[in-house]
Swiss-Prot record:
The lineage of its organism: Eukaryota, Metazoa, Cnidaria, Anthozoa, Hexacorallia. The chain crosses the membrane at residues 22-42, 58-80, 102-122, 155-175. Residues 1-21, 81-101, 176-377 are cytoplasmic. 3',3'-c-di-GMP binds at residues 206, 272, 278, 300-303. It is a multi-pass membrane protein. Residues 43-57, 123-154 are extracellular. GO terms for molecular function: 2',3'-cyclic GMP-AMP binding; cyclic-di-GMP binding. This is Stimulator of interferon genes protein. Its main location: endoplasmic reticulum.
Length: 377
Protein backbone atom coordinates (compact mmCIF):
# COMPACT_ATOMS: atom_id res chain seq x y z
CA UNK A 1 0.00 0.00 0.00
CA UNK A 2 1.37 3.41 -0.90
CA UNK A 3 2.01 5.69 2.04
CA UNK A 4 -0.40 8.33 0.72
CA UNK A 5 -3.20 5.75 0.78
CA UNK A 6 -2.74 4.78 4.42
CA UNK A 7 -5.35 5.70 7.05
CA UNK A 8 -8.13 6.17 4.50
CA UNK A 9 -6.04 8.52 2.38
CA UNK A 10 -5.06 10.64 5.38
CA UNK A 11 -1.46 9.57 4.83
CA UNK A 12 1.22 8.17 7.08
CA UNK A 13 1.09 9.18 10.73
CA UNK A 14 4.74 9.37 11.80
CA UNK A 15 5.74 7.77 15.07
CA UNK A 16 7.36 9.77 17.80
CA UNK A 17 11.12 10.04 17.55
CA UNK A 18 13.02 7.83 19.95
CA UNK A 19 15.92 9.38 21.84
CA UNK A 20 18.58 7.26 20.16
CA UNK A 21 20.70 10.16 18.90
CA UNK A 22 23.07 10.16 21.93
CA UNK A 23 23.75 6.46 21.33
CA UNK A 24 24.61 7.06 17.67
CA UNK A 25 26.79 10.03 18.66
CA UNK A 26 28.62 7.86 21.20
CA UNK A 27 29.33 5.22 18.56
CA UNK A 28 30.54 7.89 16.15
CA UNK A 29 32.79 9.40 18.81
CA UNK A 30 34.37 6.03 19.58
CA UNK A 31 34.99 5.37 15.89
CA UNK A 32 36.60 8.80 15.40
CA UNK A 33 38.89 8.31 18.41
CA UNK A 34 39.96 4.87 17.21
CA UNK A 35 40.64 6.10 13.66
CA UNK A 36 42.52 9.21 14.81
CA UNK A 37 44.82 7.51 17.28
CA UNK A 38 45.31 4.36 15.21
CA UNK A 39 46.40 6.39 12.18
CA UNK A 40 49.11 8.15 14.12
CA UNK A 41 50.06 4.98 16.02
CA UNK A 42 50.85 3.31 12.72
CA UNK A 43 52.82 6.21 11.28
CA UNK A 44 54.82 7.23 14.36
CA UNK A 45 57.44 5.53 16.53
CA UNK A 46 58.87 5.79 20.03
CA UNK A 47 58.54 9.21 21.64
CA UNK A 48 56.54 10.42 18.64
CA UNK A 49 53.57 8.44 19.94
CA UNK A 50 53.66 10.20 23.30
CA UNK A 51 53.88 13.57 21.60
CA UNK A 52 50.99 12.57 19.34
CA UNK A 53 48.83 11.75 22.35
CA UNK A 54 49.61 15.10 23.95
CA UNK A 55 49.06 16.91 20.68
CA UNK A 56 45.67 15.31 20.06
CA UNK A 57 44.58 15.92 23.66
CA UNK A 58 45.70 19.54 23.43
CA UNK A 59 43.93 20.06 20.08
CA UNK A 60 40.64 18.58 21.25
CA UNK A 61 40.71 20.35 24.63
CA UNK A 62 41.39 23.69 22.98
CA UNK A 63 38.60 23.19 20.44
CA UNK A 64 36.10 22.14 23.11
CA UNK A 65 36.96 24.97 25.48
CA UNK A 66 36.76 27.47 22.62
CA UNK A 67 33.27 26.24 21.79
CA UNK A 68 32.22 26.32 25.45
CA UNK A 69 33.43 29.90 25.90
CA UNK A 70 31.67 30.92 22.69
CA UNK A 71 28.41 29.28 23.82
CA UNK A 72 28.59 31.00 27.19
CA UNK A 73 29.17 34.33 25.45
CA UNK A 74 26.11 33.71 23.26
CA UNK A 75 24.02 32.93 26.33
CA UNK A 76 25.25 36.18 27.89
CA UNK A 77 23.83 38.04 24.90
CA UNK A 78 20.50 36.27 25.43
CA UNK A 79 20.58 37.18 29.11
CA UNK A 80 21.16 40.84 28.26
CA UNK A 81 17.88 40.84 26.32
CA UNK A 82 16.00 38.96 29.06
CA UNK A 83 17.28 41.40 31.69
CA UNK A 84 15.34 44.16 29.91
CA UNK A 85 12.13 42.18 30.61
CA UNK A 86 13.03 40.92 34.07
CA UNK A 87 10.10 42.67 35.77
CA UNK A 88 7.37 41.60 33.33
CA UNK A 89 8.57 38.06 32.58
CA UNK A 90 10.28 36.98 35.81
CA UNK A 91 8.64 39.18 38.48
CA UNK A 92 11.98 40.83 39.08
CA UNK A 93 13.71 37.54 39.89
CA UNK A 94 17.28 37.61 38.63
CA UNK A 95 17.68 33.94 39.59
CA UNK A 96 14.83 32.84 37.30
CA UNK A 97 16.21 34.86 34.40
CA UNK A 98 19.63 33.26 34.83
CA UNK A 99 18.18 29.75 35.11
CA UNK A 100 16.15 30.04 31.91
CA UNK A 101 19.05 31.53 29.95
CA UNK A 102 21.91 29.36 31.16
CA UNK A 103 20.01 26.07 31.41
CA UNK A 104 21.92 23.19 29.81
CA UNK A 105 20.92 19.59 29.32
CA UNK A 106 22.97 17.02 31.21
CA UNK A 107 24.32 19.61 33.68
CA UNK A 108 26.31 17.17 35.79
CA UNK A 109 27.96 15.57 32.77
CA UNK A 110 28.73 19.01 31.38
CA UNK A 111 30.45 20.09 34.58
CA UNK A 112 32.52 16.92 34.91
CA UNK A 113 33.48 16.94 31.23
CA UNK A 114 34.45 20.61 31.34
CA UNK A 115 36.63 20.00 34.39
CA UNK A 116 38.21 16.97 32.76
CA UNK A 117 39.01 18.77 29.54
CA UNK A 118 40.42 21.72 31.47
CA UNK A 119 42.79 19.39 33.33
CA UNK A 120 43.81 17.74 30.06
CA UNK A 121 44.31 21.15 28.50
CA UNK A 122 46.62 22.27 31.30
CA UNK A 123 48.48 18.96 31.33
CA UNK A 124 48.97 19.08 27.58
CA UNK A 125 50.32 22.59 27.83
CA UNK A 126 52.96 21.92 30.50
CA UNK A 127 56.54 22.98 29.80
CA UNK A 128 57.54 19.53 28.62
CA UNK A 129 54.32 18.82 26.79
CA UNK A 130 53.71 22.20 25.20
CA UNK A 131 57.17 22.44 23.79
CA UNK A 132 56.71 19.12 22.10
CA UNK A 133 53.22 19.93 20.99
CA UNK A 134 53.73 23.40 19.63
CA UNK A 135 57.42 23.80 19.04
CA UNK A 136 58.60 20.24 18.77
CA UNK A 137 61.09 18.41 20.96
CA UNK A 138 64.46 20.18 20.92
CA UNK A 139 66.25 16.87 21.29
CA UNK A 140 64.33 15.19 18.49
CA UNK A 141 65.99 14.51 15.24
CA UNK A 142 65.28 17.07 12.49
CA UNK A 143 63.26 14.67 10.39
CA UNK A 144 61.23 13.62 13.46
CA UNK A 145 60.46 17.24 14.35
CA UNK A 146 59.40 17.96 10.79
CA UNK A 147 57.13 14.94 10.75
CA UNK A 148 55.68 15.90 14.13
CA UNK A 149 54.89 19.55 13.33
CA UNK A 150 54.09 19.62 9.64
CA UNK A 151 53.68 16.07 8.39
CA UNK A 152 50.50 15.14 6.59
CA UNK A 153 49.77 12.48 9.20
CA UNK A 154 49.78 15.03 12.01
CA UNK A 155 47.62 17.50 10.12
CA UNK A 156 45.14 14.76 9.19
CA UNK A 157 44.88 13.59 12.79
CA UNK A 158 44.29 17.13 14.06
CA UNK A 159 41.60 17.64 11.43
CA UNK A 160 39.76 14.51 12.58
CA UNK A 161 39.91 15.63 16.21
CA UNK A 162 38.83 19.23 15.59
CA UNK A 163 36.23 18.74 12.86
CA UNK A 164 34.64 15.42 13.82
CA UNK A 165 35.15 14.58 17.47
CA UNK A 166 34.37 17.97 19.01
CA UNK A 167 30.86 18.32 17.47
CA UNK A 168 29.94 14.81 18.65
CA UNK A 169 31.00 15.53 22.22
CA UNK A 170 29.22 18.89 22.12
CA UNK A 171 26.03 17.13 21.06
CA UNK A 172 26.32 14.48 23.78
CA UNK A 173 26.75 17.16 26.44
CA UNK A 174 23.62 18.98 25.30
CA UNK A 175 25.40 22.20 24.35
CA UNK A 176 23.40 22.43 21.12
CA UNK A 177 20.06 22.26 22.93
CA UNK A 178 17.98 25.42 22.86
CA UNK A 179 17.71 27.31 26.11
CA UNK A 180 14.26 27.84 27.59
CA UNK A 181 14.43 31.43 26.40
CA UNK A 182 15.06 30.35 22.81
CA UNK A 183 12.29 27.74 22.96
CA UNK A 184 9.87 30.41 24.13
CA UNK A 185 10.99 32.78 21.37
CA UNK A 186 10.54 30.06 18.76
CA UNK A 187 7.05 29.20 19.97
CA UNK A 188 6.01 32.85 20.05
CA UNK A 189 7.34 33.48 16.55
CA UNK A 190 6.18 30.38 14.67
CA UNK A 191 3.08 29.17 16.57
CA UNK A 192 4.71 25.81 17.17
CA UNK A 193 2.38 24.90 20.02
CA UNK A 194 -0.93 25.47 18.24
CA UNK A 195 -1.87 21.80 17.77
CA UNK A 196 -0.82 20.77 21.28
CA UNK A 197 -2.88 23.56 22.80
CA UNK A 198 -5.92 22.70 20.71
CA UNK A 199 -5.72 19.04 21.72
CA UNK A 200 -5.51 19.87 25.43
CA UNK A 201 -8.35 22.37 25.15
CA UNK A 202 -10.54 19.84 23.33
CA UNK A 203 -9.89 17.30 26.06
CA UNK A 204 -10.36 19.48 29.15
CA UNK A 205 -13.18 21.52 27.66
CA UNK A 206 -15.25 18.65 26.29
CA UNK A 207 -14.02 15.07 25.95
CA UNK A 208 -12.88 14.65 29.56
CA UNK A 209 -16.44 14.78 30.90
CA UNK A 210 -18.61 13.63 27.96
CA UNK A 211 -16.77 10.42 27.05
CA UNK A 212 -17.12 8.74 30.47
CA UNK A 213 -20.89 9.46 30.40
CA UNK A 214 -21.44 8.52 26.75
CA UNK A 215 -22.86 5.04 27.26
CA UNK A 216 -25.16 6.27 30.03
CA UNK A 217 -26.58 8.94 27.71
CA UNK A 218 -27.26 6.28 25.07
CA UNK A 219 -29.01 4.05 27.61
CA UNK A 220 -31.17 6.97 28.76
CA UNK A 221 -32.43 7.46 25.19
CA UNK A 222 -35.21 4.92 24.60
CA UNK A 223 -34.93 5.23 20.82
CA UNK A 224 -31.36 3.92 20.79
CA UNK A 225 -31.27 1.77 23.92
CA UNK A 226 -31.96 -1.53 22.15
CA UNK A 227 -30.63 -0.79 18.68
CA UNK A 228 -28.69 -3.60 17.06
CA UNK A 229 -25.44 -2.88 15.26
CA UNK A 230 -24.90 0.16 17.50
CA UNK A 231 -21.23 0.61 18.41
CA UNK A 232 -21.36 2.66 21.59
CA UNK A 233 -18.32 4.82 21.08
CA UNK A 234 -17.75 8.37 19.90
CA UNK A 235 -16.18 8.39 16.45
CA UNK A 236 -14.15 11.59 16.19
CA UNK A 237 -13.70 12.53 12.53
CA UNK A 238 -10.36 14.03 11.48
CA UNK A 239 -10.20 15.00 7.77
CA UNK A 240 -6.68 15.69 6.54
CA UNK A 241 -7.61 19.18 5.26
CA UNK A 242 -9.26 20.20 8.58
CA UNK A 243 -12.44 21.31 6.78
CA UNK A 244 -16.03 20.02 6.61
CA UNK A 245 -19.64 21.05 6.09
CA UNK A 246 -21.72 21.54 9.21
CA UNK A 247 -23.99 18.65 8.24
CA UNK A 248 -22.65 15.16 7.63
CA UNK A 249 -25.51 13.60 5.57
CA UNK A 250 -25.45 14.72 1.94
CA UNK A 251 -22.14 16.56 2.35
CA UNK A 252 -19.15 16.25 0.03
CA UNK A 253 -17.96 13.42 2.27
CA UNK A 254 -21.26 11.54 1.72
CA UNK A 255 -21.68 11.65 -2.09
CA UNK A 256 -24.06 8.67 -2.22
CA UNK A 257 -26.31 9.86 0.64
CA UNK A 258 -25.77 6.68 2.65
CA UNK A 259 -25.57 8.47 5.99
CA UNK A 260 -28.80 9.42 7.75
CA UNK A 261 -29.34 11.49 10.88
CA UNK A 262 -31.42 9.47 13.36
CA UNK A 263 -31.64 11.81 16.34
CA UNK A 264 -29.81 13.02 19.43
CA UNK A 265 -29.09 11.31 22.72
CA UNK A 266 -30.53 12.57 25.97
CA UNK A 267 -28.38 15.56 26.94
CA UNK A 268 -25.76 15.55 29.64
CA UNK A 269 -26.42 18.53 31.91
CA UNK A 270 -23.42 20.28 33.39
CA UNK A 271 -22.99 23.74 34.85
CA UNK A 272 -19.88 25.14 33.25
CA UNK A 273 -18.37 28.53 32.46
CA UNK A 274 -21.18 30.40 34.18
CA UNK A 275 -23.89 28.64 32.15
CA UNK A 276 -26.32 26.83 34.44
CA UNK A 277 -27.05 23.22 33.35
CA UNK A 278 -25.50 23.50 29.91
CA UNK A 279 -26.63 20.66 27.61
CA UNK A 280 -24.19 18.33 25.86
CA UNK A 281 -25.86 15.96 23.41
CA UNK A 282 -24.60 13.69 20.66
CA UNK A 283 -25.99 12.98 17.21
CA UNK A 284 -26.65 9.38 16.18
CA UNK A 285 -26.31 8.40 12.52
CA UNK A 286 -27.39 5.40 10.48
CA UNK A 287 -25.11 4.04 7.76
CA UNK A 288 -26.21 1.25 5.42
CA UNK A 289 -23.72 -1.27 4.13
CA UNK A 290 -23.68 -3.08 0.79
CA UNK A 291 -26.34 -5.52 1.98
CA UNK A 292 -28.60 -2.62 3.02
CA UNK A 293 -28.08 -3.51 6.67
CA UNK A 294 -28.14 -0.46 8.98
CA UNK A 295 -25.32 0.36 11.36
CA UNK A 296 -25.61 3.03 14.06
CA UNK A 297 -22.96 5.23 15.62
CA UNK A 298 -22.20 8.61 17.14
CA UNK A 299 -20.03 10.74 14.87
CA UNK A 300 -18.74 14.27 15.17
CA UNK A 301 -15.85 16.26 13.79
CA UNK A 302 -12.93 17.33 15.95
CA UNK A 303 -14.09 20.95 16.00
CA UNK A 304 -10.73 22.49 17.09
CA UNK A 305 -9.34 21.55 13.67
CA UNK A 306 -11.43 24.33 12.13
CA UNK A 307 -9.08 26.73 13.91
CA UNK A 308 -6.15 25.26 11.98
CA UNK A 309 -8.11 25.58 8.73
CA UNK A 310 -9.06 29.19 9.44
CA UNK A 311 -5.46 30.03 10.28
CA UNK A 312 -4.31 28.51 6.97
CA UNK A 313 -6.72 30.61 4.86
CA UNK A 314 -6.70 33.84 6.88
CA UNK A 315 -5.10 36.98 5.50
CA UNK A 316 -2.38 37.37 6.47
CA UNK A 317 -2.09 33.62 6.90
CA UNK A 318 -0.66 32.39 10.18
CA UNK A 319 -0.12 28.86 8.84
CA UNK A 320 0.88 27.65 5.40
CA UNK A 321 -0.83 24.59 4.00
CA UNK A 322 2.28 22.52 4.69
CA UNK A 323 2.39 23.74 8.29
CA UNK A 324 -1.32 22.98 8.69
CA UNK A 325 -0.81 19.43 7.41
CA UNK A 326 1.98 18.97 9.93
CA UNK A 327 -0.09 20.47 12.75
CA UNK A 328 -3.06 18.16 12.18
CA UNK A 329 -0.75 15.17 12.65
CA UNK A 330 0.59 16.71 15.86
CA UNK A 331 -3.00 17.27 17.02
CA UNK A 332 -3.94 13.67 16.25
CA UNK A 333 -0.94 12.24 18.05
CA UNK A 334 -1.30 14.50 21.08
CA UNK A 335 -5.04 13.85 21.41
CA UNK A 336 -4.49 10.10 21.23
CA UNK A 337 -1.80 10.28 23.92
CA UNK A 338 -4.06 12.35 26.18
CA UNK A 339 -7.11 10.11 25.83
CA UNK A 340 -5.14 6.89 26.21
CA UNK A 341 -3.71 8.29 29.43
CA UNK A 342 -7.21 8.79 30.90
CA UNK A 343 -8.68 5.47 32.03
CA UNK A 344 -12.18 6.94 32.09
CA UNK A 345 -11.93 7.65 28.35
CA UNK A 346 -10.26 4.44 27.22
CA UNK A 347 -12.39 2.30 24.92
CA UNK A 348 -15.03 5.00 24.52
CA UNK A 349 -13.76 6.68 21.35
CA UNK A 350 -12.20 6.11 17.94
CA UNK A 351 -10.15 8.63 15.99
CA UNK A 352 -11.14 8.37 12.33
CA UNK A 353 -8.64 9.85 9.89
CA UNK A 354 -9.51 10.18 6.21
CA UNK A 355 -8.81 12.13 3.05
CA UNK A 356 -11.46 14.51 1.62
CA UNK A 357 -11.71 12.40 -1.54
CA UNK A 358 -12.89 9.32 0.40
CA UNK A 359 -16.49 8.26 0.94
CA UNK A 360 -17.07 8.70 4.66
CA UNK A 361 -19.71 5.94 4.67
CA UNK A 362 -17.15 3.37 3.48
CA UNK A 363 -14.57 4.62 5.97
CA UNK A 364 -17.04 4.42 8.85
CA UNK A 365 -18.38 0.98 7.93
CA UNK A 366 -14.86 -0.44 8.10
CA UNK A 367 -14.34 1.23 11.47
CA UNK A 368 -17.68 0.02 12.83
CA UNK A 369 -17.08 -3.57 11.79
CA UNK A 370 -13.57 -3.53 13.22
CA UNK A 371 -14.86 -2.08 16.49
CA UNK A 372 -17.60 -4.70 16.72
CA UNK A 373 -15.01 -7.44 16.33
CA UNK A 374 -12.86 -5.88 19.06
CA UNK A 375 -15.70 -5.83 21.58
CA UNK A 376 -16.93 -9.28 20.55
CA UNK A 377 -20.13 -8.09 18.92
Amino acid sequence: MRRAEENNGFGTIPKRRNQHTPFYASIGMIVVIIVAFTSYHITSYGDDRNRAMRQYSFTFSLAYLAFLVGELLRRCCLFAEEYRHIETRYNGSLKKAIQTTFSFGHNNVLFVASLLFFVVFVASNDPNGSSSVIQGNSTAEPHTEMRQTSGWQGLWGQFIISALLTPLVVHLLGLRELSKVEESQLNEKENKNVADGLAWSYYFGYLKFVLPELEKQIEKTSKFRSKEKFVKKMFILIPSNCFWDDKIPGSDYDPQNRITFEGNTEPLEKTRGGVFLRHYKHSVYEIKDGENEPWFCIMEYATPLLTLYDMSVAQPGELSREERDAQVVVFLRKLQDILEGDRACQGKYELVTFSPDRDLADVMLRKLKDSELEIGG
